[in-house]
């Protein structure tokens, strides 16, 4: 998932992985906080 800001990742991460938390690192979303 491409991103510029960490908040760009929140919806896609939740939608695709169910993970509630996300960070944008090197223009790529890192999803975490998954159960």
Swiss-Prot record:
Q: Which UniProt keywords apply?
A: Disulfide bond, Ion channel impairing toxin, Neurotoxin, Potassium channel impairing toxin, Secreted, Toxin, Voltage-gated potassium channel impairing toxin
UniProt name for this protein: Potassium channel toxin alpha-KTx 6.15
Organism for this UniProt entry: Hemiscorpius lepturus (Scorpion)
What's said on domains? Answer: Has the structural arrangement of an alpha-helix connected to antiparallel beta-sheets by disulfide bonds (CS-alpha/beta).
Keyword Disulfide bond listed? yes
Q: Which InterPro entries does this UniProt record tie to the protein?
A: Scorpion_toxin-like_sf, Scorpion_toxinS_K_inh
Residues under site feature: Aromatic residue of the functional dyad: 32
Query: Hey, which family's this protein in?
Result: Belongs to the short scorpion toxin superfamily. Potassium channel inhibitor family. Alpha-KTx 06 subfamily.
**Residues at the site labelled Basic residue of the functional dyad:** 23
The Gene Ontology terms for molecular function here are: potassium channel inhibitor activity; toxin activity
Q: Keyword Disulfide bond on this protein?
A: yes
Using the chain's own numbering, where are the disulfide bonds? 3-24, 9-29, 13-31, 19-34
Q: What does this protein do?
A: Blocks voltage-gated potassium channels rKv1.1/KCNA1 (IC(50)=13 nM), rKv1.2/KCNA2 (IC(50)=16 nM) and rKv1.3/KCNA3 (IC(50)=2 nM).
Report the main location listed first in the record.
secreted
Q: Where in the cell is it found?
A: Secreted
Tissue specificity of this protein: Expressed by the venom gland.
GO annotation, cellular component aspect: extracellular region
A biological process (GO) of this protein is: envenomation resulting in negative regulation of voltage-gated potassium channel activity in another organism
